[in-house]
Amino acid sequence: MHKIQKMSCTPSVRSRYTLKRKRLNSAKSATLKKKKVFLSNSEFFAGVSTNYELGKDFLREMDTPICTSNTVFLPVKFSDVAPGRCLTLSPYGHSSVLGFHCQECKPDSSSGFTQAQQSAESNELLSVNLCFLNNVEKVVQHKAFYLSLLGHSMNTVKQSLGQPSLLYCYTVLKKFYPQIFPIFTANGPMLTMYIIFTSLTLHVSEAVLRILTDNVENHNLSADCYKGHYILSIEPQALEESNLNVCVTKICDLVAQLDFSDELKQEYVNGSTLIANFLN
């Protein structure tokens, strides 16, 4: 009888012991949680820099970048975008994204600029002077560029020949955005070029940013939004020192023969009105 009673009590004793052990473990866990120390960025990087092995272990555990996308505010200068990043502008927000993490910037995308493309273009897009000399007489191919200048006057066409960076930027942008139409404004002896996009979103690839910022000097290149239109601005900060020899008379004669169709005239008028309001 005594033996039966002892056996019946055993499960109860074990249950109380198990419950007590769980409570102790729970208390220890709570204590550990309370003892968590949060480090500031400077403290974390200071620790990693002094303990090389810890830094390597931390990097091994990373499978994605710490930050793939940063919010940007318009207007944004191209020079302020960190190398290796692109720009994505939309009604829902604007951001700069790591190029290799962007679907649009991958080599198989039309926005990408691969080594093969560089070779095919004979590196023309990587040199302002070379690109200008190769394209300045291709008046029909760059019809929109020259007709927009002619909308001011033939003297404005001549004036543009002293600013090779304008035709260079237009040629680069046209490779990525074939349907662009530039608008020009004059500020004394210098011309500023604006490219207007009417799409809801605009992606400026890492390749475009890299090519323009690496090769165009003394210009403020920026993106802004006005009345639902995205506007890229190419504004000179100083007169260009250009010693390139071009046949001005020949180019002006070719421009004078261009057909300024009603459709292009309307696009020119609409664009000029938008830019005038944008600048006021």
Curated annotation (Swiss-Prot):
A zinc finger (CCCH-type) spans 86-203. Phosphorylated at serine residues in the N-terminus. This phosphorylation regulates the localization within the inner nuclear membrane. The keyword Methyltransferase does not apply. GO terms for biological process: viral budding from nuclear membrane. One of its GO terms (cellular component) is membrane. Pfam families: Herpes_UL31. Its main location: host cell. Keywords: Host membrane, Host nucleus, Membrane, Metal-binding, Phosphoprotein, Zinc, Zinc-finger. It is found in: Host nucleus inner membrane. One of its GO terms (molecular function) is zinc ion binding. Transmembrane segments: none annotated. InterPro entries: Herpes_UL31 (IPR021152). Belongs to the herpesviridae NEC1 protein family. Plays an essential role in virion nuclear egress, the first step of virion release from infected cell. Within the host nucleus, NEC1 interacts with the newly formed capsid through the vertexes and directs it to the inner nuclear membrane by associating with NEC2. Induces the budding of the capsid at the inner nuclear membrane as well as its envelopment into the perinuclear space. Forms a heterohexameric complex with NEC2. Interacts with capsid vertex specific component 2/CVC2; this interaction directs the capsid to the host inner nuclear membrane to initiate budding. This is Nuclear egress protein 1. It comes from Alcelaphine herpesvirus 1 (strain C500).
